[in-house]
Amino acid sequence: WHANANPMARLCHHGGTGGTWVNKEKEYMMYTNDNRIVMTLDAGGTNFVFSAIQGGKEIADPVVLPACADCLDKCLGNLVEGFKAIQAGLPETPVAISFAFPGPADYQAGIIGDLPNFPSFRGGVALGPFLEDIFGIPVFINNDGNLFAYGEALTGALPDINRRLREAGSMKQYKNLLGVTLGTGFGAGVVINQKLLLGDNAAGGDIWCFRNKKYPEYIVEESVSIRAVMRVYAERSGDTGVHTPKEIFEIAEGICPGNREAAITAFSELGELAGDALASAITLIDGIIVIGGGLSGASKYILPALLKELNSSTGMMDGSRFGRLQMKAYLLEDAESFADFAKGGAVEVPIPGTNRKVGYDPCKRIGVTVSKQGANRSIAMGAYVFALNHLSKGI
């Protein structure tokens, strides 16, 4: 508290030689060789899945117990039972417990608020202090959007992109990231220069409640979620049956019968409205956008509309037009797009009064990519590294 790889199944800083990021990547390599053990939890509304990580690898067979979300005593009892079962099979004593849990919550204090999917959590449940009293080790709780972003920033997309840029001969290195999960809801987390943005009210990165571009009276999550894909497909196709996003994706692919145009539109509309929200968010963050979650498996239909929205234009009353973003957004999954992203617009400019020149890249740019390690892995690694970082700093 101190506060799915199968996509459809889980359906600019100029750093000189990039030395700062090389050091950060070496720092992560230290974690992969770290012998400290952290117990983790995947907290779903139906089941709890317990495990443990050492050196960046899962070292325990997962233990699965029902969440018992409607009975607080049973829920807390299963949390204790699950962690004790994991602890009993470990080669040494774990140094911490770290996991994601739904909000609202005061994550720093380890107190969980009134949860829609956990009816028994009402009036504030001191989950962190409870577990710390039982196990005698620090407990760190965050939301899944934050831990997804943290995992991608330290162990996933960000170090991978910076490595690829160096290999391409680019001097550009990135240190800021907006992590986005597309699934039951529209989650997000922000990492600025290796630091997770928690916010003064544990609400940092909450993008789900942004205004909806198409339906301004509603939140954007109404158009960026599993329920949105299902709703739009039904509206466009006239099909009164209930179709899951996986089925709608297969209709779009031509694998299953159905209205293919409506299926494609269901995902592209999500991309457009997610792109509108992300354009506002990334204007403040100015970094890499990485997308995960179950719906990211349909990225081929989501990302074109999302990129189009990011690179759209706006204007002034005098008729002037300019980009919605100061930066151009590139799709990093595409080889040609990545090559342009890496190349930028680097030139050399003279230093007045001397014979020397310095490098200058006037091309402001960001990248959009899909998580390669998957949301579950990124969240677990985010929880693991979050705990080790805080323990090392004595927080």
Task: Give the location of each predicted region.
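A short local loop/turn or secondary-structure capping micro-motif enriched for an aromatic residue
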Residues: 1, 68-71, 123, 158, ...
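Short hydrophobic alpha-helical segments enriched in small aliphatic residues
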Residues: 3-5, 14-15
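ATP-binding/phosphotransfer module of carbohydrate and carboxylate kinases, centering on a glycine-rich
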Residues: 19-95, 106-109, 133-137, 160, ...
